[in-house]
Amino acid sequence: MKIAFMGTQCNGKSTLIEEFLKRWPMYKQPKSTYRKLIKSGKITNNEDGTQESQKAILNAIIDDTQAATATGDKFLVFDRCVIDNIVYSLWLNEHGKVSDEFIIDSRLIAIQAVKTFDIIFYVPLREEIKITPKKSRAIDPVYRQEIDHIFRALVGTYEKQQGIFFPKEDCPAVIALEGPPDLRIEQIPLYIKPSGKFFDESDGSLLSNI
C-alpha cells in the first residue's frame, strides 16, 4: 500500500500525516530528499520557482518514491507526490515563468509516475487554518488559495476520467478529505482498514457496508 497526501501549503497536511501514522503505525514515511533540496537554498520554489527548480523537484519526488518502493516495505505514506509538483508548475505557467512545453513534458512524466500509488488523499484548503511562517514556505494567503483552486481543478479531471493529469487505467483512487481539520482523520477509516489495507471492490468501503 502506497498512500500520498497532496494539497496546498499551510493547510494542516503534515499534522494530518502525523495523526495517520499514530492510527496506522505499520506505515512508514520515507525521508524526503526534495525537501532537503529546497532547504539547501540551491533552488527556488513556490512563487519564485523556475523550470530548472521545478524539474529538479519533480525528479527528486520521483527518486524518493522509487527508492522507498525498492525497500520492499509494504506500507508507505508520502507527504506530497508528483501531482503537487504539477500544480505548482501550472501556477508558474499561468504567470509566465515556465513554458507550455515544460508543462506538457512534466504532465507526461507525472501521469506515469502517479501509478505507483494506491490512494492519493487530497486535503482541500480550510481558510480557518492559520499560516505559520517557516523557512522555504509561502505565506501569502492569496497564493495558498490559488494553489488550492488548481488542485481542485486537477481532481475534477480525475472525477470526470478525462485522463489529462491522472491516467484512465491503473490510476490510484483520489479522495478529497472535505470538512474541518478535526474530521479529516475520521474519514480515512472509510477507505483504510485497521490492518492498513484499503477497502477494494471485492469488499466495498466501510460506508457501503453500513
Where are the predicted features?
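Hydrophobic anchor at the beta1->P-loop junction of P-loop NTPases
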Residues: 5
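The conserved Walker
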Residues: 9
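Conserved lysine of the Walker
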Residues: 13
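Conserved substrate/cofactor phosphate-moiety recognition/catalytic segment
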Residues: 18-63
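Short loop/turn segments at strand-loop or loop-helix junctions that form parts
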Residues: 32, 79-82, 121-127
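Glycine-rich phosphate-binding loop used to anchor ATP phosphates in small-molecule kinases
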Residues: 55-115
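A glycine- and Lys/Arg-enriched "phosphate-lid" helix/loop adjacent to the NTP-binding pocket
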Residues: 88, 92-159, 170-178, 203-207
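C-terminal accessory "lid"/substrate-recognition subdomains
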Residues: 159-176, 182-210
